[in-house]
Amino acid sequence: MLFRSSAYQKSPVGCLFYDFFGGNTLKADVSISVTELGSLLDHTGPHLEAEEYIARAFGAEQSYMVTNGTSTSNKIVGMYSAPAGSTLLIDRNCHKSLAHLLMMSDVVPLWLKPTRNALGILGGIPRREFTRDSIQQKVRDTGGAQWPVHAVITNSTYDGLLYNTTWLKETLDVPSIHFDSAWVPYTHFHPIYQGKSGMSGERIPGKVIFETQSTHKMLAALSQASLIHIKGNYDEETFNEAFMMHTSTSPSYPIVASIETAAAMLRGNSGKRLIQRSIERALDFRKEVQRLREESDGWFFDIWQPEAVDKAECWPVAPGEDWHGFKDADADHMYLDPVKVTILTPGMDEQGNMDEEGIPAALVAKFLDERGVVVEKTGPYNLLFLFSIGIDKTRAMGLLRGLTEFKRAYDLNLRVKNMLPDLYAEDPDFYRNMRIQDLAQGIHRLIRQHQLPQLMLKIGRASWRERV
């Protein structure tokens, strides 16, 4: 046995490391040679018990713990489901790990093309892409392609759009479907997500459904904690070969323990309450921003959402509505997750119409960053925030306070030196006498001059030949 925890205490710098992380954390980082703990690679002992427990919690027939991230989980599922020489359908809005899978495997990809609005938000793959006629046309247009044996779909999108997975599972004519659900490991634990996740509902005859999740995203688990869930008949021995190919023989036991802990936190009514609190926190924040916008003198931030957000639900991206900015949206197809909050800044509407004046979101993101508020994603005029189970009222109010402080400072037209000191420090000569409104309008004019939103849409059409 390797006594790594004791080894740290053999040197001064090691003692500092030991004191920072604590003895229990380092003592838990044991060697795979500890037979009492079983094996992650062979799925024996406590590891097997944990995976069976997790499967029951997440509504799967079988679950696998992965200690090097969903990037690895995606490759495991792909290498099992799409053998060399086969053809697969793959979301053009896929994670880089799936692009790496294509580089590693001798497979033929048929791209499923998502829509995109002027804000830069991906709207999911339209229903027309999933029809037999559309898939057959892709096969005819792609050299070496055959009818696909597997499909990969990103659910949800980064911005929080979820598919009607019940329809997809019943409609898509392939033997196996993989939902890359890295950002939504919580969907099984609240009724508003019913029919919008891979493991939702009963098994589909003749199909196997895979769902990969980043347990450390949005839940309580250590970084690189990931899960593979399976529903349907599959070859366990062959699957485990792919699992072992991508799994270290020295897995991190603290990561394993954190995955099982995350499952335990979510089981039963206590888990539902955790997710319910996140949803309520996000809804309260959305309503407060809308209230401030209605009461504000002049401008204030807006939120990308329907007009009525009175109750906990996933809001449909319905055809004929302007708020989402997607042309030809399908009915009962895509839904907005309430815990994924996109803030809109002045300057452009959802249809891509530019105003004379505007506040590029990058300036707001910089202001918030200098105050310790993490922005998940920044577009030209939008910012994404995630309301995970770790977000409490204090943090939510901290974000709201940051937005109101930005408005106050912007309306006072403070100097960049005083409002964004870190930005000023990057080039004092350039920003010396500049005020925030001058900087904002200068960037906004450049965006208008070069027609950035339209250019981004053209890039999308050039890459995907997509009509947005």
Where is each model-derived feature located?
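Short N-terminal secondary-structure initiator segments
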Residues: 49-63, 182-193, 201-208, 317-328
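Alpha-helix N-cap/helix-initiation sites
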Residues: 66-67, 252, 378
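Short glycine-rich or small-residue beta-strand-to-loop segments that form or flank ligand, phosphate
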Residues: 37, 64-66, 151-154, 384-388
